[in-house]
Amino acid sequence: MARGLRPPLNGGGTRFLLYPQLPGLSNEVEPEIVFVSSPAGSVGVGPQDHRMYVVDPIGKERPYGFYPDGEGGIFHYRPPWDGPVVPPAAPGPGGHFDHLPFGTPQFEHAHAFGTVRFVLDIWESYFGHHVPWHFAEAYDRLEIVFLRGLDNAYAGFGSLEIGNYMQAPGIPVDFGLSFDIIAHEVGHLVIYSQIGLPDTDDLDGEYYGFHESAADLVSLVSLMHFESAFIGLLEESHGNLYSYNLLNRFGEVSDFEQIRLASNERKLYEFVDGWSKEHALSQPLTGAFFDIWVDIFHSKLWERGLISLHLEELSDRLEGDPGYHDVIQPLFDQAYRLAPEGFAQALAEARHHMGISLAVTWQRLSPFELDYEDVYKAYLETDALINGGRYRDMIVDNMEWRGIGKVKAGPRIKPPAADSHAFSPRTQTPPSQPQPHICSHGMPYRLRMARARGKVPA
């Protein structure tokens, strides 16, 4: 069952069965009962509630976005889908959705809805307030829409489109069953809401990398709210989070294939001459935050007397060394055997700290001229605000080891790829619509941008 959430989610909401890991990655993966905040009985056929709804169209041939109209102009193809649909998922007894059989479209519909709602609940808890959709002036609800054959998933203006593809003949990979991929897209929506949409595509390259990194971190922290993933991580790694395990995999589609790694050694120095894919550019920032999280976890273990100062310092010193695992893992194995519950408590505290500190940091950012150094400085400010600067040295060491605050990424050297998320026709605000975002600072987006440019007084 969901672990570590505020009380209304642990028994007072609507039940769903969610897979923390894409089925097929492991023979042992099982779905977990998760409660979301929508009161039992309030989620209707679809599923749908007041924030979102699911449709599985029949005959939808392309993603939403901007397309030529055949007469030299452009038209915006966007929600809602008003054509025929696959029969939707219906609630069972008590208004819950944990009764649907695996392997049916209706199970996938419920899984996608439950994932979006669960991740949104988690991050609204961390932010401490309602997270509105960035398209709220145009649409009341997010359309979670399936597009079979789309080899990706996209968060866009009013929609989250979910595809699938054939990994091999007769072996589909259904992204509606991938908690990680959907959670990543919800991460984009959270960032659009809390930071805002830029009003130009002439952006610092690091903005794109930041968006991918933030979405990965939303997914990573959310994953740790599954009890099976949380306990499984500890039982697999014995607290040595640099081990190769489920936490380090993002966008997985098989036991051996991953899109990105959280635990990586990439540095911003690699990109000073330019970059082509925001997924790659995101890795130094994601890696820095992952390393900070591990350092904080180790610090909490040491404070509880569960590991020695020698082990903590040795782990830091050997990080990246080829012999790291052979030296460090036996020491973690021994320490974990003595106090598994203490390790779990320390990891829960580190998870909570990361969620809160990321939420506070992101609210201090603006999309205008956003780069990694801005994120670095905002995170230091957050640490000073909520911890009295307790983790400053950890933050400085990990960020600057990655080159963050030392160098900047160069220009984009290739046009945006088809899978670019951060600023594309799928996410642009329609020209006829005002910018819908009202930022978390209580100031309309356009006024905030004008102030950032110095066109209005602060």
Predicted feature descriptions by range:
Residues 1-117, 121-125, 133-137, 192, ...:
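Acidic/polar low-complexity interaction segments
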